[in-house]
Amino acid sequence: MKQLLDFIPLILFFITYKLGGVREAAIVLVVATILQIVILKWKYGIVEKQQKIMASAVVFFGLLTAYFNEIRYLQWKVTIINGLFAIVLLVAQFQFKTPLIKKLLGKELQLPEKAWNTLNLGWALFFIICMLVNIYISHNMSEEAWVDFKSFGIIGMTVIATIISGVYIYRYLPKDGSNSKDGEK
């Protein structure tokens, strides 16, 4: 249910854009995102930091989009958020010597430090690619093409990145069913 809630604002944005236009879609996106946060808080008692950041960005850029009736503000959101995620992952790894992916998944997975570093860099690269593809599409293709990319392309890219991460992690999982503490093969 929690994962489904993440997609509802995006689906409603896409449908409203196709039926109404930019302003209407932005308003629906903002309202649906606020409702999503309220439901998460009510049902689960907590809203994760990443969800708060994303919701704040959606509300801010969505309201700008609705007010000016100009989609470029939502296009900026995608670029800025992906860029920030990449920067945070890279700064955590190189400045603080802590792969952030390990902080997020370290309780569930036991992997060698090299694997955590590779995963962290892989996801930073993914966010950079998403940012660059978003810039390219928003500047060189139609508004409708960008909405399609935002609604489906980024999801597809995320699924592919998740599968690649899963395949990479799998090679470090214990093969005999034991719980190896160091995650070595």
UniProtKB/Swiss-Prot annotation:
Full protein name: Inner membrane-spanning protein YciB
Function text: Plays a role in cell envelope biogenesis, maintenance of cell envelope integrity and membrane homeostasis.
Lineage: Bacteria, Pseudomonadati, Pseudomonadota, Gammaproteobacteria, Pasteurellales
Regions that span the bilayer: 27-47, 53-73, 76-96, 118-138, 149-169
Keyword set, alphabetical order: Cell inner membrane, Cell membrane, Membrane, Transmembrane, Transmembrane helix
PANTHER family: INNER MEMBRANE-SPANNING PROTEIN YCIB, INTRACELLULAR SEPTATION PROTEIN A-RELATED
Location within or outside the cell: Cell inner membrane
Family that this chain belongs to: Belongs to the YciB family.
